Amino acid sequence: ILLERDQLTSGTTWHAAGLVSQLGPSAAITKIRKYTLDLYKELEKKVDHSAGLRLNGALSIAETKGRWQELQRQATTAQLYDVDVRILDKDQIKKDYPIVNTEDVIGGILMPGDSAADPKVVTHMLAKAARQEGAQIFEKSPVEEIITKDGKISGVKVKGQTIECEYIVLASGMWSRQIGEKAGVSIPLYPAEHFYIITEPIENLSKTLPTIRDFDNRTYIKE
């Protein structure tokens, strides 16, 4: 049973960036991310519902020695999980992606298999797949109370009705802290502002431009 306080994608999902990357800061995260991309591709065929995937790849650039070492370590990890990754020097980056100012760039890694997806479309694809496997989804059903007995979860109260259960998966994003308090659990989570800029059309910008991540400047761009 999935309980949605409003409607699917009505929270922060609708304006999410939708980046689907494979490379993570650790082996475990890399494995999970690769599984996610594979799952989306599989479900597109299984439930006949698009995930809105655009396989344009992703380019991460480094402007400090520390960041360059980090990206190279991540590239090694990616190779262990058969993730296609290519290490590029600044000259190659400038040649292939002239939109990038490489004056301060040391190098970068290209992940051709990375993609971007439509968050709303992905959500409804997952919901469709879940329903086909017997899941029930109830919208406009905010959880009013989490019921515990002898220190264990025993149910939730929704619209004055009690649903008995043994386990709860809390997937409420930035609202998880408040929901956790209903069960006496302290979740150290606090939302932070995030900004994005939409530009005017850029002449001759390739439709296949990869997502470009500049971690040193805490920014990314995508077409």
Q: How does the language model describe each region?
A:
Residues 1-14:
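Glycine-rich FAD pyrophosphate-binding loop
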Residues 9, 67, 123, 175-176, ...:
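Glycine-rich nucleotide phosphate-binding loop and flanking beta-alpha elements
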Residues 18-96, 216-221:
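Dinucleotide-binding Rossmann-like beta1-alpha1 core, especially the glycine-rich loop
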Residues 21-23, 146-223:
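Flavin-dependent oxidoreductases
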Residues 49-60, 74, 94-133, 154-155:
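Helix-loop-beta segment of a Rossmann-like dinucleotide-binding subdomain
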Residues 84, 136, 186:
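Residue-level detector of anion-binding/catalytic polar loops
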Residues 109-167, 171, 175:
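Helical element adjacent to the flavin cofactor pocket in flavoenzyme catalytic cores
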